[in-house]
């Protein structure tokens, strides 16, 4: 007799879970109860769900599972940053990073194993593309991290840990890990909906950010299906340079990208788009580039996030000197462009923005790769 694959409940958003429970004759409130057990309480056993009927739990045990990806390693930085390496099979892995700050806790999650966009400055792209992640594997990163962090948390040190305030460990999620989220849209969408669902993680639309290299048609779909904070990997102020740094620009050039950003803003929870700009020595960091970037930024409501490049041997690129980054940022601010600079985090555990390569076979090259995790922490100019 052929066995039937059991349904992984981690990958079902509220509508899909209600449909499943309805097929068994269950009421919608049962689906909500089940969703809270899985995502809010972090249950991985149906026996623990004591307020559900015994026959319902038996049905769940027969037909369903609650399974995240296997964890190969966990690393902790001296600055509090934590990283998990999840096994996706065939010797490949994805990486998930938690960045604690005084006023928030941000989880950076992956949407693909590898990436097809192949941005020149990103080591993930240099690793090639393995496969899309399933919705259960995407939300499973949040599910796992929430369980681990909450189990170990000292309440007095949680973000927002004052009396009467939200004391959740993970207050923000950014889809800025491995992969291009909008090229895995059908699996990313239910994961995003779960992040926002009050019966699951209950995050604000302003606190969930999708970062895209500029997949214009899917930006339009996201604005209709699940509008939330959007970051665009810009990295160049003109098409000629962006064609070289972000090859997707050859399909969706800057004029199309900026128009899509303007359309997105009509539905977005924030009144601006974040443009990410990796600072590359002698490549995109000159005064002329700053002038071009100012003209581009004035075409859409945005803020600029300047990212120090984290070198890796295959790129052939170098990080812009700190003094050059400061001058570049000041020029933008003097022109009235809101600008932030990211601070490096987790450099001792190889947890870098644009550097998540998910290596399983060789985890010993941390010094060689010299990667750093970066997060936005300061405004350059008030």
Curated annotation (Swiss-Prot):
Its main location: cytoplasm. Binds 1 [4Fe-4S] cluster. The cluster is coordinated with 3 cysteines and an exchangeable S-adenosyl-L-methionine. This is Dual-specificity RNA methyltransferase RlmN. GO terms for molecular function: 4 iron, 4 sulfur cluster binding; metal ion binding; rRNA (adenine(2503)-C2-)-methyltransferase activity; rRNA binding; tRNA (adenine(37)-C2)-methyltransferase activity; tRNA binding. Its cofactor is [4Fe-4S] cluster. Residues 101-348 form the Radical SAM core domain. InterPro entries: Aldolase_TIM, Methyltransferase_A, RlmN_N, RNA_MTrfase_RlmN, rRNA_lsu_MTrfase_RlmN/Cfr, rSAM. GO terms for cellular component: cytoplasm. Keywords: 4Fe-4S, Cytoplasm, Disulfide bond, Iron, Iron-sulfur, Metal-binding, Methyltransferase, rRNA processing, S-adenosyl-L-methionine, Transferase, tRNA processing. The active site is at residues 95, 353. It is found in: Cytoplasm. Reaction proceeds by a ping-pong mechanism involving intermediate methylation of a conserved cysteine residue. Belongs to the radical SAM superfamily. RlmN family.
